């Protein structure tokens, strides 16, 4: 199995919009291409921001790469993402003013021995 963690720091005034976008746009698209969501959580980061993270599961790293390639090739989805950014001032504006940090990280299993 391959697991990844998607991590964000988001300004509090954008939390509702960010959650709506995930549930309405990103989650259905990820699932339709074969991603499996283990869970998604949020917690206060400081008085102005909220931390989000999601854990995703794949059968292998190769499956993850294949699924991600399908997602970025999905022009309908890509256009929805572009339109969402534009509705909020453009991608650069959103990433400078609302979504302050993004990480996409491989997780390493510490319970099951690797062979």
Describe the function of each predicted region.
Residues 1-17, 36, 106-115:
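Surface-exposed interaction/gating patches
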Residues 41-44:
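Short, solvent-exposed loop/turn elements at beta->coil junctions and helix N-caps
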Residues 20-39, 57-103, 115:
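An amphipathic, aromatic/His-enriched active-site/gating alpha helix that lines ligand/cofactor pockets
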């Amino acid at each position: 199995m391959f697991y990844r963690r998607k991590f964000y720091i988001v300004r509090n005034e954008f939390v509702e919009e960010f959650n709506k976008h995930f549930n309405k746009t990103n989650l259905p698209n990820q699932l339709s291409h074969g991603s499996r969501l283990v869970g998604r959580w949020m917690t206060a980061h400081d008085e102005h921001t909220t931390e989000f993270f999601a854990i995703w599961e794949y059968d292998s790293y190769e499956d993850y790469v294949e699924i991600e390639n399908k997602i970025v090739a999905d022009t309908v989805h890509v256009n929805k993402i572009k339109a969402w950014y534009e509705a909020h001032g453009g991608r650069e504006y959103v990433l400078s003013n609302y979504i302050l940090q993004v990480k996409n990280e491989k997780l390493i299993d510490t319970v099951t021995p690797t062979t």
